Amino acid sequence: MTQSAAQSPKNPGTSPPIAQVEGAQISALQTGLLDWYAANRRDLPWRQTRDPYRVLLAEMMLQQTQVPRVLPRWHAWLERFPTLEALAAAPTADVLREWSGLGYNSRAVRLQAVARHVVAEYAGIMPRDVPTLLALPGIGEYTARAIACFAHEQDVPVLDTNVKRVLHRVLLGPDVPKPLVNDRQLWALAERTVPIGRGYDWNQGLMDFGSIICTARKPACLVCPLRPICRAAPTIGTALAEQQGARRRAGRSDAPAAVPFTSTARFFRGQILRALGAQPANAGLTLDALGARIKPDYAAAERPWLHGLVAALHRDGLVTADPAPARPAAVRDGAAPYMTENAAPTAQDDLANVRVTLPHG
Ligand code: SF4
């Protein structure tokens, strides 16, 4: 089974390892993996629907959140926003409130941007083909193919981290200390592996297999049904042990001390959105009031730090700051893609007047 070039990432490369993968090896993988999936498939609610909106929601939530945490939130979200139209029409502040606690809140804004675009441009009907899906705002290679496969049952490869790892190990060899091929080459290989008419089970099965059996750090090679055909099986244990040894040695010498999560910008971004979500609609908070809610020992001297966080959230469309933060010079010049704690060039007294709210739209 091969896919059309129009459905591949641009210019997929080839390499000697990929050229050496034989059809018989791929057939054996297809048989072994589909047999394993038939006996071990997880009963997940987004596998009982082909509604593109529900599939898209699951994919967005699962991108950086584990299945057990996503399950109740997926149901709750659909209670609140049962259709693309409902999501498109909702105030962004409500969307962010509903997403609160899942982390990486820009996913919620992207999800609503897709909903608004599909409602405005496609009468609320999600496109089917990969090139058109790729043209939607915030939809990348993975998500476009996930919708094409999991909503429309097209035989396209869906390559997430787990799938990449499984294909690499079984067909090419150990993926440690580093992969033998790059992502584009792996996409080209993945195109050859999708069984005709079985793309849905194939991709779901690969994802399950990668998260249950062929995990990144502790693959269950001893009980793995693919062991007889797996090119990594003879050496994967040794390769992982050597990699872990190298990590330990680096940890003893010059590795930086781990930073507690509660000290990170990501933690405080979440705290800011949670504090604003608890406010009445459009009420907002000054920087100092916001700081007191997210940090017990907050002091006015920390306004520039807090303003830096707010400026980054403002730029991501997750909050509205009034007055709007000036764009940092480094970003204007294209030299730095992301500002975190760097304060915009605003005087300390001016910062006291900044009000922050969830987006009004
Ligand atoms: S034998 Fe080990 S490395 Fe190969 S697919 Fe199975 S779990 Fe993964």
Annotate each language-model stretch with its function.
Residues I147, L309-A312, R355-P359:
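Residues in the recognition helix of alpha-helical DNA-binding motifs
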Residues R269-L273:
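Hydrophobic residues on short alpha-helical segments
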Residues H314-R327:
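A short, conserved structural fragment
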Residues S4-Q7, A241-Q243, R249, D333:
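Acidic, low-complexity intrinsically disordered tails
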Residues M1-S4, P9-Q25, R41-R42, S253:
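Short, contiguous pre-domain boundary segments
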Residues A324-G361:
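Short, cationic-aromatic polyanion-contact patches
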Residues G32, W36-R266, G277-L285, R293-R303:
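Catalytic cores of DNA base-excision repair glycosylases
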Residues Y298-H314:
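Short amphipathic alpha-helical interaction segments
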